[in-house]
C-alpha cells in the first residue's frame, strides 16, 4: 500500500495503466480528498517491486509513506531527518497542527507546540509587534497579517519553518515561511486545511516540489510591506493597434529619409536609380561568378 497526497487521481490511473504487461502487476487506488491510496498486486515479487518502484519515481514528491504510515508521522520523520525546527506563528495554525502531532514519537524534538512561539507570554507579543511593523498601519487583510506573522515568528524564534493561517469567510490561506520565502495555499471550506498544511511542511522540509496549486512568494518580495501584487491596470483594447501603427509610421519615415538622401531630394528619380542599381548586379551572359 502506497500513500500519496496531492497527486492527481487521473495521473495515478494513467501511470497504472502504462505498467509493462511483463511485470504482471495490477493496482487499485482510492482517492479521498487530496489523499490517494494505491494497493499493488503482482504474480511475482520482482514484478511487485518494479511496479512499486515505478510509482515511487512517478510520484516521488507526492509519496509520503507506505503501509500504515500517516501524514503527521511522515512530517515528523521529514523534520527529524533534515534537522528542521517547526513553529506556529498564530493560534489558528497551532489548532491545525498540535492535535495531529501530539503523542507522535519525536514530535517534541522538531515542533514546539507553541511553547516558544505564539503561546509564549514573552515571545507571542514580540511576534505580533514585529509583524505589525512590517505592515501598513491601516492593513486589515488577514493574508497580509498571516504572512507578516509567519516571517516575524521565524526570525524571533530562530526556527527553520514557521506556519500561519489566514482565516477568511469562505476559505483559509495557509502560509509556511522558510529561509527562501513563503509558501501559500488557499483551501476552500470543504477541504481539510490541516492535511494540506502538513503536506506543505513535509515537502518543504524534504526540499521536494509542492503540489499543484501551492504558490510561492520569494523572500525579497515577502519582506516588503506591500507583499501582495496589486491588480494590473486594464489596457485599452486599441492600445496594441495604436502602437503597431506608430511603429509602421516610424519605419515609413526612416525609409523616406533614406530615399531623400539617396536621390538628393528628387523622389521622381528613385525608380530609375533603383532599376540601374539592380541592373549593375545582374550577371551578364558568359560572366563568371566569383
Regions from the PLM with identified roles:
Residues 5-26:
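Short amphipathic alpha-helix segments
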Residues 46-243, 248:
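Short alpha-helical segments enriched in small residues
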Residues 262-282:
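Ser/Thr/Pro/Gly-rich low-complexity linker/stalk segments immediately outside membranes or between
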Residues 1:
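Conserved anion/nucleotide-ligand pocket segment
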Residues 31-36:
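Short Gly/Ser/Thr- and Asp/Glu-enriched loop/turn motifs at secondary-structure junctions
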Residues 252-261:
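Hydrophobic alpha-helical membrane-insertion segments, chiefly the h-region
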Amino acid at each position: 500500500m502506497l500513500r500519496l497526497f496531492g497527486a492527481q487521481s487521473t495521473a495515478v490511473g494513467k501511470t497504472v495503466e502504462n505498467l509493462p504487461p511483463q511485470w504482471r502487476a495490477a493496482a487499485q487506488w482510492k482517492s479521498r480528498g487530496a489523499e490517494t491510496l494505491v494497493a499493488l498486486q503482482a504474480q511475482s515479487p520482482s514484478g511487485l517491486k518494479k511496479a512499486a518502484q515505478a510509482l515511487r519515481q512517478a510520484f516521488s514528491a507526492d509519496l509520503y509513506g507506505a503501509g500504515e504510515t500517516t501524514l503527521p508521522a511522515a512530517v515528523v520523520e521529514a523534520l527529524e531527518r533534515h534537522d528542521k525546527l517547526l513553529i506556529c506563528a498564530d493560534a489558528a495554525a497551532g489548532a491545525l497542527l498540535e492535535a495531529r502531532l501530539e503523542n507522535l514519537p519525536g514530535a517534541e524534538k522538531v515542533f514546539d507546540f507553541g511553547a516558544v512561539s505564539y503561546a509564549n507570554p514573552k515571545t507571542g507579543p514580540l511576534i505580533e509587534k514585529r509583524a505589525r511593523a512590517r505592515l501598513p498601519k491601516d492593513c486589515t487583510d488577514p493574508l497580509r497579517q498571516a504572512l507578516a506573522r509567519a516571517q516575524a515568528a521565524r526570525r524571533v524564534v530562530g526556527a527553520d519553518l514557521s506556519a500561519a493561517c489566514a482565516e477568511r469567510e469562505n476559505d483559509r490561506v495557509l502560509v509556511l515561511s522558510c529561509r527562501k520565502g513563503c509558501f501559500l495555499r488557499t483551501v476552500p471550506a470543504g477541504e481539510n486545511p490541516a492535511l494540506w498544511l502538513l503536506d506543505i511542511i513535509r515537502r518543504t522540509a524534504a526540499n521536494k516540489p509542492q503540489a499543484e496549486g501551492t504558490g510561492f512568494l520569494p523572500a525579497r518580495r515577502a519582506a516588503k510591506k506591500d507583499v501582495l501584487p496589486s491588480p494590473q491596470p486594464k489596457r485599452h483594447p486599441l492600445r496594441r493597434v495604436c502602437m503597431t501603427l506608430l511603429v509602421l509610421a516610424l519605419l515609413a519615415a526612416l525609409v523616406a529619409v533614406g530615399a531623400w538622401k539617396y536621390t538628393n531630394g528628387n523622389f521622381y528619380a528613385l525608380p530609375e536609380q533603383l532599376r540601374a542599381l539592380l541592373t549593375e548586379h545582374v550577371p551578364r551572359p558568359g560572366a563568371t561568378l566569383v
